[in-house]
Regions:
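N-terminal secretory signal peptides that target proteins for export/translocation
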Residues: 1-5
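Sec-dependent N-terminal signal peptides of Gram-positive bacterial secreted proteins and lipoproteins
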Residues: 6-27
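Cellulosome-associated attachment modules in secreted, modular CAZymes
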Residues: 23-29, 509-562
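N-terminal non-catalytic accessory region
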Residues: 30-193, 197-252, 388, 395-509
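Aromatic-acidic/polar surface patches that form glycan- and anion
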Residues: 136, 163, 167-170, 372-375, ...
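Short amphipathic alpha-helical segments that mediate assembly, nucleic-acid/protein binding
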Residues: 140, 258, 291-292, 322-323, ...
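Alpha/beta-hydrolase fold catalytic core
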Residues: 154-161, 165-168, 294-398, 420, ...
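Serine-dependent carboxylesterase/thioesterase catalytic core
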Residues: 168, 172-346
């Protein structure tokens, strides 16, 4: 072949090669570790809700709270005088005015469809800026910041709950988000994390749409199995735990000042028995019904009972009894409004279909998550414990994250009652191949739906995402994991952890100060590692930094290495 022909041949070959390469899918040129976008579903009340004119209707504005407090003075005065009828009429009116903008009709539809979150961010955080997306009246959580640092603000999305919409509507919104993210980012899957009620929405989405579009499922103190407290309330079980009320107030206020005042004056000891007596007092109409029945019928049913999404908070073992109790109150509520029996029946049929569909998902969530894992989707569950919950039901002594009971957020852990242990003779309930008992004797994780993929953090609040140190690190690792993590995946983050409010660190429950290499014992090796870190010769993990600060000064120095 002549040189000219060879040149022509090579030129044609190169041209053909370039032509073929033009048609090779773009994915072939993408990096193997392409970032998977993250969608965070916020919890109940994390976004302010506004009406069609932009007026804040939930959470209550400062002005609304002040007005409510002023309006409550007269009814409270009547209560102290023993005038229960005036007191009940007053508080029912106050509560109904407060909840009316976010209430639902007896068939489960919103009374005011124009009420929605103050802002819904349909684009990634980068389009608005972190300060905008985490401002006070929306999702003001450091977890967004942590995710942005890990995968870039262009790959993080946040969904705010218009929580009085049905779970079916909320799940449909999530599906719309997921499809948009996939199209915009040219990805096959999205990592989804659900916080609090957002976890119940995530569960509903998985039950209705499956997990084919989901790379990672992360439950963050999630209500995906309900709340014992709500189950009790929907069954009509109210009980104020005086001994738990002051600790709960102190915990909520992050101070014991108010608790000390209340305890010294014995105000709660005087007020609570009187309140319980009021609830059980029969109405003066001779019906045999009590003031508790009246409050449920005229207030709680319209404020919460008709809201189908809140029924996702009723755990499976409470559900049938709760339906029977609330149905009776709902019927009475509508009868008092002059609604005919046929319309009442039609309303219930429509409402029941909505709540039953979502309840069936909750009742089968273990199987749903197991199937997700089997299909290659990573599933991680995070549950906090050792905090008081609102003490207004018989389950007030359940350990919790301050809002939801730990046995619920963990998907079934066996938990000791608050400030107690399971006992020295307690034996792990199930053999799952490794120890599932917390070193403090409070938790048995073997009874969880996914004991291999469930972590517990002691003393960490329901909505705490403390990013000052490593308080978001484990969560972000789970959201971005390329394969299924287990409680053995990260040595610095075993199954049982503890949050230190003074240092802002999350560390193993068994962590020993000075044990820098985390091998369970303190040796000269630990001193050497601390010195190397001080001299800039060694990098330490967040947990190692936590234990290296042996003298708790807030900084690692040569004194810690001594």
């Amino acid at each position: 072949m002549s040189k000219n022909r060879m040149k022509k041949f090579v030129s044609i070959l190169l041209a053909l090669t370039m032509t073929v390469l033009c048609f090779v899918p773009a994915a072939a040129a993408e990096p193997k570790d392409k970032v998977t976008p993250i969608l965070i579903i916020a919890g109940f009340g994390e976004y302010v809700l506004v009406d069609g004119d932009g007026n804040q209707v939930w959470g209550p504005s400062q002005d609304a709270i002040v007005e409510t407090a002023k309006n409550a003075i007269a009814p409270l005065g009547a209560f102290l005088k023993g005038d229960y009828e005036t007191f009940c009429t007053g508080i029912v009116e106050i509560a109904n005015n407060l909840f009316e903008p976010v209430s639902c009709n007896p068939d489960g539809t919103a009374k005011h469809p124009d009420v929605t979150v103050i802002d819904q961010y349909t684009e990634p955080v980068s389009q608005y800026g972190l300060d905008e997306v985490t401002r006070g009246d929306v999702f003001d959580k450091d977890i967004v910041d942590a995710c942005c640092d890990e995968v870039g603000a262009d790959n993080v999305y946040v969904y705010g709950l218009t929580w009085h919409k049905s779970m079916q509507e909320l799940a449909a919104d999530i599906n719309t988000y997921v499809q948009k993210i996939k199209a915009d980012k040219h990805v096959d899957k999205v990592s989804i994390a659900g916080h609090s009620m957002g976890g119940a929405v995530l569960a509903s989405y998985l039950g209705l749409y499956g997990c084919d579009d989901v790379s990672n499922i992360t439950m963050l103190n999630s209500a995906f199995t309900g709340l014992d407290m709500v189950g009790c309330l929907f069954k009509g079980e109210i009980a104020v735990g005086i001994d738990k009320l002051i600790p709960f107030i102190n915990q909520s206020m992050n101070s014991d000042t108010l608790g000390k005042v209340l305890d010294t004056l014995k105000l709660l000891q005087l007020a609570v028995p009187k309140l319980e007596g009021f609830l059980e007092t029969e109405l003066p109409d001779g019906s045999g019904r009590t003031y508790k029945d009246r409050i449920y019928t005229e207030c709680l049913v319209s404020g919460f009972g008709y809201t189908p999404s809140l029924w996702a908070f009723v755990p499976d073992e409470y559900y049938d009894d709760a339906k029977a109790v609330m149905k009776a109150y709902m019927e009475k509520n509508q009868q008092q409004s002059g609604v005919s029996a046929s319309v009442i029946a039609a309303n219930w049929a429509t409402f029941e279909r909505k709540i039953d569909e979502i309840h069936d998902i909750q009742a089968n969530i273990s199987s749903i998550l197991q199937r997700a894992k089997a299909s290659g989707t990573s599933v991680c569950i995070f549950s906090n414990y050792n905090l008081y919950i609102a003490p207004f039901t018989p389950t007030a002594d359940y350990t919790s994250d301050g809002v939801i009971e730990t046995n619920r957020t963990s998907g079934g852990a066996t938990c000791a009652r608050l400030k107690m242990t399971l006992g020295d003779d307690y034996v792990q309930a199930r053999d799952v191949g490794h120890n599932c008992l917390s070193e403090d004797g409070i938790i048995d994780a073997s009874t969880c739906m996914l004991p291999e993929n469930t972590w517990f953090i002691k003393n960490y609040g329901h909505s705490m995402f403390d990013y000052r140190k490593n308080g978001c690190d484990l969560y972000v690792r789970a959201m971005t994991a390329k394969t299924q993590p287990t409680v053995d995946t990260w040595a610095e983050y075993p199954q049982f952890l503890v949050y230190n409010a003074g240092t802002h660190y999350v560390a193993p429950l068994t962590a020993k100060f000075g044990d820098v290499d985390l091998d369970g014992s303190i040796t000269p090796v630990d001193s050497r590692l601390a010195l190397r870190y001080v001299n800039g010769m060694e990098e330490l993990s967040p947990t190692a930094k936590y234990v290296a600060d042996a003298n708790r000064s807030g900084d690692i120095s040569t004194f810690d290495a001594e």
